[in-house]
């Protein structure tokens, strides 16, 4: 069997390429996913939603590969001075102009408070840095998404401000009371201001308020299918606790007809929901029920307790029972030959003479990255992109 592991809660580290010091903090909202991170998860080269396709057409794919760099280096709390009206989602940077497109069909995430009245926001960060604050703003009632987002479209005060939070497993987890009286679709605007640097990060988060009074679930992220899978493939949802230990595993071998990109997430979700009371997959309704849908990206993974993360493993059947690709010692390229053709599963020979295989999406985008960081066996972050065979 050919084994792929798509880690949806832990994504590759992207290091700053323009600073002399070691690591430069980057990040974006993971739960609910920010606009840029959600489009990245759809696949930079072939996004699924019309809005993300339009963002790529307007600004190119690099903006999505750089999902954790929507920032201003000299903000120092003066956010309205460095991020102009109409450019909030792209932080005033030309690279991210596609995120500023004024349209009503940006994919949104349904959110609702838990039993204590809070919602847990999860921010994915690449390095621990001192935080001055995380501020959360919400659009005013009557906001028109078909007009460019301006500062005046936001409520004047943040509905939540976090000044002390610890980085755990690459994420900041923040419990916030949701704003009162909001219904339907809105944009949450998040600002992360560092205290050890004037740098700040910005994120537009498209949400819809479900109207649920008490939500018993914690959202971990979307279950996304990038492509159809062959019949006979096995997909496994793995749930890890706060210590990184396997808490649950749910496997399903796909039958013909249940292996399409819209069908296999539904089939896996139905099995998980039948077998587990801790984790459910689907779309949350106003009454706290999680129902699976036939979709490549709309199903969310929910747990009843905080502190978990998930991963989806995919095993593909090998025709004729042969070895996995690369098992015969052959390679597709001698690195860095054919660099722009590298994709998930590409096997290369590194400078050390060893064979490396490009990891599955979403890591596969880094296989084409700068050799200083992603040269197999040599780059500073090569293990984010490659598996040693």
From Swiss-Prot:
Gene3D superfamilies: 3.30.70.2150, chitin-binding protein cbp21 (2.70.50.50). GO terms for molecular function: chitin binding. Disruption phenotype: Decreases chitin-binding, has no visible effect on extracellular staphylolytic or protease activity. Decreased association with the hyphae form of C.albicans strain SC5314; P.aeruginosa does not adhere to yeast form C.albicans. InterPro entries: Cellulose/chitin-bd_N, GbpA_2, GlcNAc_Chitin_IntDeg, Ig_E-set. It comes from the Bacteria. GO terms for cellular component: extracellular space. Residues 1-25 form the signal peptide. Its main location: secreted. Coiled coil: none annotated. Can be detected in the extracellular supernatant as a 43 kDa protein and a 23 kDa protein, both proteins have the same N-terminus. Only the larger protein binds chitin, which may protect it from further processing and/or degradation by elastase (lasB). It is not clear whether the short form is functional or a degradation product. One of its GO terms (biological process) is protein transport by the Sec complex. Residues 26-208 form the Chitin-binding type-4 domain. Pfam families: GbpA_2 (PF18416), LPMO_10 (PF03067). It is found in: Secreted. Keywords: Chitin-binding, Secreted, Signal. Transmembrane segments: none annotated. Binds chitin but does not hydrolyze it, has no detectable protease or staphylolytic activity. This is Chitin-binding protein CbpD. It comes from Pseudomonas aeruginosa (strain ATCC 15692 / DSM 22644 / CIP 104116 / JCM 14847 / LMG 12228 / 1C / PRS 101 / PAO1). The lineage of its organism: Bacteria, Pseudomonadati, Pseudomonadota, Gammaproteobacteria, Pseudomonadales.
């Amino acid at each position: 069997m050919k084994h792929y592991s798509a880690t949806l809660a832990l994504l590759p580290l992207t290091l700053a390429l323009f600073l002399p010091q070691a690591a430069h903090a980057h990040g974006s909202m993971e739960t609910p996913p920010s606009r840029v991170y959600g489009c990245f998860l759809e696949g930079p080269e072939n996004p699924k939603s019309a809005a993300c396709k339009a963002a790529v057409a307007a600004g190119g794919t690099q903006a999505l590969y750089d999902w954790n760099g929507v920032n201003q280096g000299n903000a120092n709390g003066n956010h309205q001075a460095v991020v102009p009206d109409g450019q909030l989602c792209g932080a005033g940077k030309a690279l991210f102009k596609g995120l500023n497109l004024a349209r009503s069909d940006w994919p949104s995430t349904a959110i609702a408070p838990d039993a204590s009245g809070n919602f847990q926001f999860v921010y994915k960060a690449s390095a621990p840095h001192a935080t001055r604050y995380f501020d959360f703003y919400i659009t005013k009632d009557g906001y028109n998404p078909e007009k460019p987002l301006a500062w005046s479209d936001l409520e004047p005060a943040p509905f939540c401000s976090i000044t002390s939070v610890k980085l755990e497993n690459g994420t900041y987890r923040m419990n916030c009371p949701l704003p009162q009286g909001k219904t339907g679709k809105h944009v949450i605007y998040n600002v992360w201001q560092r205290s050890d640097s004037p740098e700040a990060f910005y994120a537009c988060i498209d949400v819809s308020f479900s109207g649920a009074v008490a939500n018993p679930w914690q959202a971990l992220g979307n279950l996304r299918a990038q492509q159809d899978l062959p019949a006979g493939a096995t997909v496994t949802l793995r749930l890890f606790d706060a210590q990184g230990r396997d808490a649950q595993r749910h496997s399903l071998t796909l039958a013909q007809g249940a292996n399409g990109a819209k069908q296999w997430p539904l089939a896996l979700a139905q099995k998980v929901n039948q077998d587990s009371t801790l984790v459910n997959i689907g779309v949350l309704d106003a009454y706290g029920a999680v129902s699976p849908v036939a979709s490549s990206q709309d199903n969310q993974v929910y747990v009843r307790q905080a502190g978990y993360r998930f991963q989806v493993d995919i095993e593909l059947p090998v025709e004729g029972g042969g070895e996995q690709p690369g098992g015969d010692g052959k390679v597709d390229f001698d690195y860095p030959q054919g660099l722009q053709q590298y994709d998930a599963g590409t096997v290369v020979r590194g400078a050390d003479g060893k064979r490396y295989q490009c990891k599955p999406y979403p890591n596969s985008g880094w296989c084409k990255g700068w050799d200083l960081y992603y040269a197999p066996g040599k780059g500073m972050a090569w293990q984010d992109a490659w598996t040693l065979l």
